[in-house]
Each structure stands twice: as structure tokens, then as C-alpha cells.
Regions:
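Substrate-binding pocket helix/loop in short-chain dehydrogenase/reductase
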Residues: 95-109
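Residue(s) in the substrate-gating loop at a strand-loop-helix junction
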Residues: 150
């Protein structure tokens, strides 16, 4: 897909891999909507890339209403969505059984919620928007969705059970 003139939603787009993706898409002539919880970093990216090319939306990817509001902001600002890159993610190291007892289930649940459920929440809403516009190229595609995984999906590391499981779910 030619990125020039296309609109992308990038989750976790204010830092790390998501920030690099945001810069790359904007550098290729795309418009980027950053979904992130870090408002200062998100606004800094808008200042760097320019408000004509970039929009920040404070979105909790796990929360359906928050994600819907972000999608609505993207469509309102740029008309549609052609690309969705899901980079939002967290990792909390904890052993299955540590000195203080078994792996805390609230930690497990939060990592799975953000990394796996949050990814699906945003991609399904982006897909709904993509399905409404005309194909963007000769093969009939209406958009592209990229979900960021990790080698941890295949090679678990000590203390990374939840992270590995969440990335395995993405794969």
C-alpha cells in the first residue's frame, strides 16, 4: 500500500516501537492518529510532526468507549482510516511462583487485557471504518492492519508468562 495520503491509527504511538512507526508513516506522507495514554508524549509527537499530519487521542485500548471515541476523532479529523498498527503493550515481570507467592492474577489479567484484548478492540473498530470506504488499490484492499508481536510468543523468558501469552495470542 502506498502510505502517502493514507490515514493510520497507531496504538502506543507516543513511545517505543509505536513512536518509530508514527514517524515512519508521517515521513512517508501519511496522516497519523496516535492512541496513547501518555498525553505529554502524544502532544510532543503532534508538535514534532505537525497538526496537519498528526492527531493525538488519549485512548485506553482496553476500554471500548475510549477506543470508539478515538476512532471517531480520527474519522472526524481525517475522514477515514486506511492503516491500523497496534503497538500498545505492557510487560510486568513476575515469576510463576516467587518468594512472595504465586504470580498475581491481577497482573496477569492487566497484561492480557492491554496486549491482547486491547489490540483486538482497536483493530475491530478500525476494520469497521475500513470496510466502509472504497478499495485503496487494484487488489480490492480497503486497508491494512498490523499487530505487533514479539519473539517472546515463541521463546518464553523467566518472569514473562503473561507477556509471552499475550504475544502468543497476537501471533
Amino acid at each position: 500500500m502506498d502510505i502517502n495520503g493514507k490515514v493510520a491509527v497507531v496504538t502506543g504511538g507516543a513511545s517505543g516501537i509505536g513512536q518509530a512507526v508514527t514517524r515512519r508513516i508521517a515521513g512517508a506522507g501519511g496522516k497519523v492518529v496516535i492512541f496513547d495514554l501518555n498525553e505529554d508524549a502524544g502532544q510532543a509527537m503532534v508538535a514534532e510532526l505537525g497538526a496537519d499530519n498528526c492527531l493525538y487521542a488519549k485512548v485506553n485500548v482496553v476500554d471500548e468507549d475510549s477506543a470508539k471515541a478515538g476512532i471517531e476523532a480520527a474519522v472526524s479529523a481525517f475522514g477515514t482510516i486506511h492503516i491500523n498498527v497496534n503497538c500498545a503493550g505492557i510487560g510486568n515481570a513476575a515469576k510463576t511462583l516467587g518468594r512472595d507467592g504465586p504470580f498475581p492474577m491481577d497482573v496477569w489479567s492487566k497484561v492480557i487485557a492491554v496486549n491482547l484484548t486491547g489490540t483486538f478492540n482497536v483493530l475491530r473498530l478500525c476494520a469497521e471504518v475500513m470496510a466502509k470506504h472504497d478499495p485503496v488499490n487494484d487488489d480490492g484492499s480497503r486497508g491494512v492492519i498490523i499487530n505487533t508481536a514479539s519473539v517472546a510468543a515463541y521463546e518464553g523468558q523467566m518472569g514473562q508468562a503473561a507477556y509471552s501469552a499475550s504475544k502468543g495470542g497476537i501471533v
